[in-house]
Amino acid sequence: MELNALIKKIESVDSYAREFLKKFEIKQEKGKFLFIAPGEDYREWLETIVNTFLEEEVRKLIEVKEKEEKKKVEIKDFLNPKYTLENFIVGEGNRLAYEVVKEALENLGSLYNPIFIYGSVGTGKTHLLQAAGNEAKKRGYRVIYSSADDFAQAMVEHLKKGTINEFRNMYKSVDLLLLDDVQFLSGKERTQIEFFHIFNTLYLLEKQIILASDRHPQKLDGVSDRLVSRFEGGILVEIELDNKTRFKIIKEKLKEFNLELRKEVIDYLLENTKNVREIEGKIKLIKLKGFEGLERKERKERDKLMQIVEFVANYYAVKVEDILSDKRNKRTSEARKIAMYLCRKVCSASLIEIARAFKRKDHTTVIHAIRSVEEEKKKDRKFKHLVGFLEKQAFDKIC
């Protein structure tokens, strides 16, 4: 039987059949006609006609099915509700980033895409990304937030389980993708390939992408040129923490921890913190030990670091002030990097605390010094024994 003849038979039962059948997908398979209904009502309508009014020989030619809906992809958004646009403290150094994100939320995917926010540690990048996610979620959008490192780990797990398509579909089904700590894509080639394809899919679908990193895309060593090019294809916004904004944050954080807004405490925090993480860390210590207790603890820690410097200066027969200066002769340079290394290993001081003790603007010099010592220890057995000896001596004498 031809399809037209079959449709005429159905029309003879119901005059509206031709219009209704336009909603069906009709396939011919193995001598049968498969009618795929768009929903339950249409399926029941056609089944009633077929089973009640058509002859047995015609019924055998017809199969009716309901269209299978694609399973909705379940999304774990990894958002923390404590981060909102309302409690993000705006100042001169972060105003542009804040305004760009707010505007993008009004026109997801069509105004600024991608948005790449960069700035040093503890300047509020994560807060802003999370706040954007929470705001978009509140408006009914599908959102996912992840750090680059978590993205890589999840991808590896899905590859092991054989569920990589589930992973891809989850990321490709969102309206807003927030990727934090983009610098951790560095050197992860397989992860970069996966993210590149997800990025392209979302971009072509005009879905919003917001990225954050501790450095400009051009400084992302170990990240492919084609990804860097995508990152630079939207809007780049630097985020900083100026003194006025830090002052506002300190006051808000003190209120948050129910601490008195004493001038000496605020002045101390302004003098001894550079970013939000440091502010929160110090305030937690003030809450725990009291302001005077914190001052005593930090004075003790600073004294230990200076004792390490003096110990190394004596061993190398150089001046303490030379170690703390920018002098670059071989003896002083070696003493300086070993002193930094011992401050980290013996006193467990933070990179920022060591940088401050050695009068450095940031902690990159400290990182370089520690890595240099560790690399030289691997190559030179004599140097390794020397560092081990100094470490033991420093620990016994100072800690």
Swiss-Prot record:
GO annotations of cellular component type: cytoplasm; plasma membrane
Main location: cytoplasm
Effect of residue 190 to D: 8-fold decreased affinity for ssDNA, very poor unwinding of 15-mer dsDNA
Region feature Domain II, mapped onto this chain: 64-77
UniProt-annotated stretches for the region Domain I, interacts with DnaA modulators: 1-64
Pfam families the record matches: Bac_DnaA, Bac_DnaA_C
Keywords associated with the record: ATP-binding, Cytoplasm, DNA replication, DNA-binding, Lipid-binding, Nucleotide-binding
CDD domains hit by this protein: AAA, Bac_DnaA_C
Residues reported to bind ADP: 89, 94, 122-127
Binding site for Mg(2+): 126, 181
Domain III, AAA+ region: region residues: 78-290
Keyword flag Cytoplasm: yes
Quaternary data: In the presence of ATP analog AMP-PCP forms a linear, right-handed spiral filament with 4 subunits arranged head-to-tail, about 122 Angstroms wide and about 360 Angstroms long. Mg(2+)-AMP-PCP binds at the subunit interface with the gamma phosphate coordinated by adjacent subunits. dsDNA probably wraps on the outside of the filament. ssDNA binds to the center of the helical filament via the AAA+ domain, which stretches the DNA.
Protein name (Swiss-Prot/TrEMBL): Chromosomal replication initiator protein DnaA
Gene expressing this chain: dnaA
